[in-house]
């Protein structure tokens, strides 16, 4: 079996050299899915996984725009249309200086499985640019978004490819992108998700990823006879996902001890309650300030510059910042402090060695493709509402989100049960694979 996996990875690596993030994502899937494929005659010999790792289409383009100093700036834009076997391409747009082909291909590949797990008819895709919205004025961001969409619009559509937000792309950017698409196409369609409520958006969509992480993690804990009530919770990040995860953790009776950004993390021993979280939302969403500004209002808290929050003793850890933020040494700290569960809010935030450390020590571990699927799930619900020309209530959407996250958890149990342990990585990968693989077989070699 190891030989088959190594041969497969060698072939994929040959075609995707110098793409470490993409190869990391492919390796994780291959190690759990290939043993399953070998046992199933219907899949064996069809090269389905090899077809999955090859994007159906890679789009790269120049994005030229003019800053406030009337200087011309040039960025690079991408859209990876990875797999459309079960529906139109669906996945976010990321605006960040680190964006490159490897990162977007890893995200698009993960998106195939994540979207499949929701059971909604959505294929996998991802896109973005190396543009950095931090420090830019609203006018500069608008000019960039308009230039970006002027090329992207010809590749997307409500039945072809439906982008959404990601790191660096929030409601402001989605608004500018949608406005330019509408201007170019002269039509009002659900071509983007994450829209404002007054112009085609869905209630709960901004909160969905963060809420979903906690709903999924709660299901894991309940399966072990546990829950968030009375638990100390460490969260990384302070963006949309982290904020919304902290909100639900608090409602469920947990105590949120930390939040972070790229400058470091804050530790509030007494807990970041709803009032304190509201202040953080003001700092990050409106003032776009660094997390350490929190201490001006709450001086009893501590700020640790250029450090990660995993050194704080906790019961539950929710990495909600970015890929590979939780390394092997961080995992060792969680093990040392008797952490019982790690639920991923970000995409691939844990390194392979960290995942191994956690699972070897029987710590419940929820891979992002399962635990953070809430965002794309409600994106799918937003698409449905756009098609119906009808809006569901907040309670209706939240109930549907809880149901979807519960179904994803059950799928992970169905495919990931081992002796006295649930391998959620294996369960999520195989459950996501089966639906897409069956569709690909039915549609022939295309």
Which residues fall in each region the model found?
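Phosphate-interaction motifs
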Residues: 61-122, 126, 130
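Glycine-rich phosphate/diphosphate-binding loop of Rossmann-like nucleotide-binding domains
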Residues: 193-196, 201-311
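Glycine/serine-rich phosphate-binding loop and adjoining beta1-alpha1 elements at the start
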Residues: 96, 115-229
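Structured beta-strand/loop patches that form or line metal/cofactor-binding pockets in enzymes
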Residues: 42-73
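Rossmann-like adenosine-cofactor binding region
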Residues: 264-365, 370
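Adenosine-phosphate binding glycine-rich loop
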Residues: 2-25, 220-221, 320, 335-446
